[in-house]
């Protein structure tokens, strides 16, 4: 299912596979501090019965590692690899693009079994095409239409500011004042602005009607770069 969702975002991924590696090989895959944490967690969760099971997943932008142990048996480590098209080769996680690797992080919000989690994400659109960002939000809204899960995120992608995905009271702006302090306020503060379509909403935002846009002084930049105007 995860591979299907990833493929639907035009990542080129056709499948996922786990490859078992020796615990000693982890030293070549994860940083020393992560390797130490794994050792400490295995020690802290030593089995008390043969039926005891322990598992953990560790990931960052370069690796996706799973550790499992059953009873008094030796722990087993696996690394996630990806397959593309009909290729027989499996690719390392770190070989994927920044956007694809980041997309893995968002699978949690789509596949979570919880009905009341709040996910907070900074710069949702980072490394994503604008269309991908929009579809991700659309899927979240559909998956969690009947539960209390919430997605709170920041973005510089103004095209996502759409009534198709959000109510007016769900769109908020951040504006920094002259002292460097940021103020957070909702679109609902402009309830009489008449922006009832997405095109109108984006136009007013880019015109600075709602604030939250950078104040760019090109003349200062040109002067600093010795660029003559005209």
Predicted regions and their residues:
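Phosphate-coordinating catalytic segments in nucleotide- and nucleic-acid-processing enzymes
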Residues: 1-103, 109, 204-208, 212, ...
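Switch/communication elements of ASCE P-loop NTPase nucleotide-binding domains
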Residues: 76-215, 227
């Amino acid at each position: 299912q995860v591979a299907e969702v990833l493929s639907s975002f035009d990542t080129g991924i056709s499948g996922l596979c786990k490859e078992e590696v020796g615990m000693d090989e982890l030293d070549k895959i994860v940083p020393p501090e992560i390797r130490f944490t794994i050792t400490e967690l295995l020690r802290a969760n030593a089995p008390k019965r043969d039926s005891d099971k322990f598992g953990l997943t560790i990931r960052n932008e370069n690796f996706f590692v799973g550790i499992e142990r059953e009873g008094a048996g030796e722990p087993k480590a696996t690394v996630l690899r990806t397959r593309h098209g009909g290729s027989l080769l499996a690719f390392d996680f770190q070989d994927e693009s920044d956007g694809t690797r980041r997309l893995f992080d968002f699978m949690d919000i789509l596949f979570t079994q919880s009905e009341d989690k709040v996910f907070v994400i900074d710069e949702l659109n980072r490394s994503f095409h604008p269309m991908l960002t929009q579809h991700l939000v659309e899927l979240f809204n559909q998956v969690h239409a009947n539960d209390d899960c919430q997605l709170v995120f920041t973005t510089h992608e103004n095209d996502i500011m759409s009534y198709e995905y959000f109510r007016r009271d769900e769109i908020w702006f951040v504006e920094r004042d002259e002292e460097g302090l940021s103020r957070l306020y909702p679109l609902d503060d402009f309830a009489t602005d008449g922006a009832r379509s997405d095109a109108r909403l984006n136009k007013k935002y880019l015109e600075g009607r709602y604030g939250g846009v950078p104040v760019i002084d090109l003349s200062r930049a040109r002067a600093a770069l010795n660029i003559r105007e005209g």
